[in-house]
Every structure is written in C-alpha cells, then in structure tokens.
C-alpha cells in the first residue's frame, strides 16, 4: 500500500485480474468474424457484450456507429474531469480473423484454453488480436471506477480484419474524434516482458494476377509442349518479383536502412518457425527487411490441387499478392509500382490480367511530446524496464484516418500482444501477464499524462525514436 493507506496501482490491477480474465474468456468464446460468408450474429453478440461491460465500467455515453457495408463501431465518451484535463482516444477492435483449418488447432479455436507448459497463457482465436487490448482498456477504466484523470473517447471497431469503410470516416466528423493523444492498442511488445512503443507501420495493398491460356484443359500427353500452361506462365511471372537473394525486385518501392531495435536472427527464426538449416531470404538488417523495406507475399493460389490433379495442361491460374511497403511511401504509388511491374511481364509472350485491390497507408508517429513522455514512464512502471522503439510490418488502416481527424494529437501504439502470439495463425495465444502489465501501463499513462499535460512545460530535449528511414 501507499503511505496514505491506499492500494498501489499494481495491487489494484492484480485485484481486478480474475474478473478481467473471465471477461476476456467470454469475449474470446464469441466467433466474431466479420468476413463475407460468416454469420453476423456473433459480431452483434460481441458488440452487445462490450457495450454492457463498458456501461458497467462507468462509461456514461455509448453510441453505435452504423455505416454501409461494415459491422457496427462502438463509440464511447467520458468527459474530462476538469476543463484543463487532456482527452485520450482509445482504439481497439472486437472482430477476429477466421480460425482457418480447425485440425491445425490444439484446442477448439473459440474455446479459450490454458496452454500447457506456458504459465498464464490462454489460446483462442482473437484472444490476443485484439480482444486482449479491448479488455486492457476496460481494465484501466475499472481501476479508476469510470472516472479517470483524463477525458476518454473509445473507438472499438467491428470489422478491422476484413477492412472497412470506417477507415475513412473519422476525417468527416473531426469534432467527434478530437483528442490530445490516442492509444492505438492493436499490437504489443517485441518480445514478452519487453515494453515496446511502435513508431511506424508499413502500408499494405493487395493485387490479383490471372492467366487464361486455353478454353478448357487438354490432355498433357497430346497437347503439352506446345499448348501454353497457364500455371507455368503465372509461376514465371511471380518469380520476377524477387532477385536471387530474395530481395523485392519491383522498381519504385522504397527501402531505407533501419537502425532501431529489432529481433535477433535466432529470435526471428523461432518466431517465423523457419526449419533448421534453411536460410532467411533477403539482404540487409532484419528491421530493413521487415519494416523499412517492401515485402511481396503470394497469399493465395488458384490451381489444381495435387490430390485431384489430372494429366492435363492447366487452362487458368490465379494468384493473390499482398504487398507491404515503407511507412512513408504513398499507398497508391506503391500499388502502382507492383501493378506496372506485373503488367510488363509476358512469359512466353502471354499477357497477365492484373487487378489492383484495396490499399492501406503506412504511418510514422511523432515522438517526444508529453504523451510520449508519459507513456515511457508508464511502460517502465508496468514492466520494470525501459521501453524499446520499433516499427512493425503490419498495418492498422484506421490510424491514418484518426490522425487526419485529430492532426495535433500524439499517436501512441502499444498493447498486450507479443511477437509469439501466433496472430492470424492457428493456436493464437495471449499471456495474462502481458494483459496485466498493459492495464497497469494504461492506468499509469493517463495518470502521468494528466499531470504532465497541465503542469508548466519547461523546455526539454525530446527522446529521439528511430524512424523507418533509419534516422536516430
């Protein structure tokens, strides 16, 4: 306890953890997948549960934002306790990725299950991404009994994973999203136990490539050797995307050195589950390959499956590509570079049909202001060690929309996930210790930010954070 007999912040959070765990398990048991072809009822169920939990936590104003072609967004407000207090916007999402092949899971994906041999770990789809962070927001509110020392605006999205027109909505209603700082909690730490602030997000886009060569399949014995094989044409085109070292070979995609914190090669090999004896691809530092340079991944392929393959020349093949690009490169510019490269390919003289898909811009955060100072103090208090600065290869499309709506706000990116959570993969898991520390960090952050925001500001030298361009 403190000198005045009150509980310490950590003791308060520890007393809340049983209830927060129970609520996390309830939320993670709901298959709130907001992809086409999935039932909408679980998404509504997750929405309603969160609204109920937020009301119980003391949020007086909760609205449902309904836009065409997207799941409902939860918007909540707690007014500032006094006119001089800052306002903090908290972001998360309650939808999840599809579970994929259930046979690859060690337990049912929507039955939260302790992970044997990993103390305090729970396994379920969405339990880390992003329901852990939504529960961390809830925990912070419970610490303060719904009356934190700052104003609060909550934005909890329902269709982040599939993509949503809500990404472009905040700039159309800037008053609603006005704030002094925002905490984007859709990520987490470089490794368990290492508090991490993310300062850059790579952008993302998708491109479809199709090849049609025959009206229908033909016997490979009679026609193979002269009839053009659509799958072979496609594979030759895809092979031009990288050079012999594995570096992306598409002209016009930005790549800069990275000089900030990153993984060791041993950590990365373990995290990426690279088989023993195989090399990593690409050149340069891991930070450069993962964060400040491009990556092109073939994420889907339409072609005959091996088990049912006939001895026939393939008439049609299609691939879906995912491009991740430098945080500061324009999204349309990056997508155009990839499309232009593919359209220039003519394997065996055969053209490709290239269809541009959706884009999500990258983002680089400003550092050094009062919110960042408060976050550094809070993260150290929660984890007991100084925070690291990193970037991430993932993207959070709404960040740019929120930043345009509140251009003066400091944007902080931290949360309860860690690099071993198996995000978007089978056997996703979260560590309750990271959830607990994130609640402590969020509660300490609003306390420190409220004090620093209203205190006279003496000149300070901001702590520099590495940018995606490598500057210190």
Over which residues does each language-model region extend?
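N-terminal helical capping/dimerization or prosegment-like subdomains
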Residues: 2-102, 316, 320, 333
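An extended, acidic, His-containing surface patch that forms the Zn2+-binding/catalytic region
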Residues: 56, 83, 164, 191-192, ...
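Active-site metal-coordination/substrate-binding segment of hydrolases
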Residues: 85-153, 175, 437
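A common structural junction motif
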Residues: 95, 241-245, 339-349
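A generic structural motif
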Residues: 128, 215-217, 323-330
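Histidine/acidic-residue-rich, glycine-tolerant segments that coordinate divalent metal ions
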Residues: 148-228
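Polar, glycine-rich mid-to-C-terminal structural blocks
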Residues: 214-217, 221, 226-271
């Amino acid at each position: 306890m403190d000198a005045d007999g009150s509980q310490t912040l950590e003791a308060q959070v520890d007393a809340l953890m049983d209830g927060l765990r129970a609520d996390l398990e309830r939320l993670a048991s709901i298959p709130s997948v907001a992809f086409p072809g999935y039932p909408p009822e679980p998404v509504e169920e997750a929405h309603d549960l969160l609204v109920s939990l937020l009301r119980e936590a003391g949020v007086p104003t909760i609205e449902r934002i309904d836009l065409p072609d997207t799941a409902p967004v939860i918007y909540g407000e707690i007014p500032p306790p006094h006119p001089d207090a800052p306002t903090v916007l908290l972001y998360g999402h309650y939808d999840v990725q599809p579970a994929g092949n259930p046979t690859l899971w060690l337990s049912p994906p929507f039955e939260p299950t302790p992970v044997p041999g990993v103390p305090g770990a729970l396994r379920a789809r969405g339990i880390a991404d992003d329901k852990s962070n939504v529960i961390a927001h809830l925990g912070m509110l419970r610490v303060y009994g719904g009356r934190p020392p700052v104003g609060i605006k909550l934005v909890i999205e329902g269709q982040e994973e599939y993509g949503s027109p809500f990404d472009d909505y905040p700039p159309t209603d800037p008053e609603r999203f006005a704030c002094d700082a925002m905490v984007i909690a859709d990520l987490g730490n470089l490794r368990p136990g290492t508090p991490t602030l993310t300062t850059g997000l790579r952008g993302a886009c998708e491109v479809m490539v199709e090849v049609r060569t025959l009206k229908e399949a033909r016997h490979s014995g009679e026609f193979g050797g002269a009839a053009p094989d659509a799958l072979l044409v496609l594979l030759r085109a895809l092979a031009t995307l990288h050079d012999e070292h594995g570096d992306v070979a598409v002209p016009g995609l930005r790549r800069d050195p990275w000089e900030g914190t990153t993984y060791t090669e041993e950590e990365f090999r373990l995290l990426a589950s690279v088989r023993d004896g195989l090399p990593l691809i690409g050149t340069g530092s891991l930070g450069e390959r993962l964060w400040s340079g491009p990556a092109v991944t073939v994420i889907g392929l339409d072609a005959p499956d091996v088990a049912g393959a006939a001895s026939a020349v393939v008439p049609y093949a299609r691939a879906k590509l995912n491009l991740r690009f430098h945080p500061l490169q324009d999204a349309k510019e990056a997508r155009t570079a990839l499309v232009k490269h593919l359209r220039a390919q003519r394997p065996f003289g055969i053209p490709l049909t290239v269809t541009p898909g959706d884009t999500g811009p990258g983002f680089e955060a400003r550092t050094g202001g009062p919110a960042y100072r408060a976050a550094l103090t809070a993260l150290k208090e929660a984890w007991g060690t100084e925070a690291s600065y990193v970037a991430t290869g993932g993207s959070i499309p709404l960040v740019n929309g929120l930043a345009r709506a509140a251009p003066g706000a400091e944007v902080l990116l931290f949360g309860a996930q860690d690099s071993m959570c198996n995000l978007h993969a089978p056997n996703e898991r979260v560590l309750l210790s990271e959830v607990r520390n994130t609640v402590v960090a969020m509660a300490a952050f609003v306390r420190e930010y409220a004090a620093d925001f209203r205190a006279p500001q003496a000149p300070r030298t901001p702590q520099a954070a590495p940018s995606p361009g490598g500057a210190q």
